Amino acid sequence: MRKIELQLREAIRNFRPFSKQNTTFSRMAGTEEGWQLCLHGNPIACFDQGGKHPTIPTYVSLAGWNTVTTRSRLNALDGVEIRTKNFTPYLNGREIEDNGWWSPCNLNY
């Protein structure tokens, strides 16, 4: 895991705003408990601080960018495993699309 991802995990666990290089973690506008993770300004994960498992993202997205960096940032999150096989992305073992939002909790067996 990259150093930036270790720092990101710490920020998420403490719900502390984080910004370094191309990655930001911040409170979502207009919400009390909603947080988002962005890569290059594109949201790739949403969190509910008041949820049952607040450090596991409510939804994740490749934001149309199935890249090594996007997958690496998402794989640094609790409850998320993104893999690619033959250019097809998989979230926690289930096939997903490059675009759209996916719930890691609803995909677990």
What is each stretch, according to the model?
Residues M1-Y109:
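Terminal leader/tail segments of proteins
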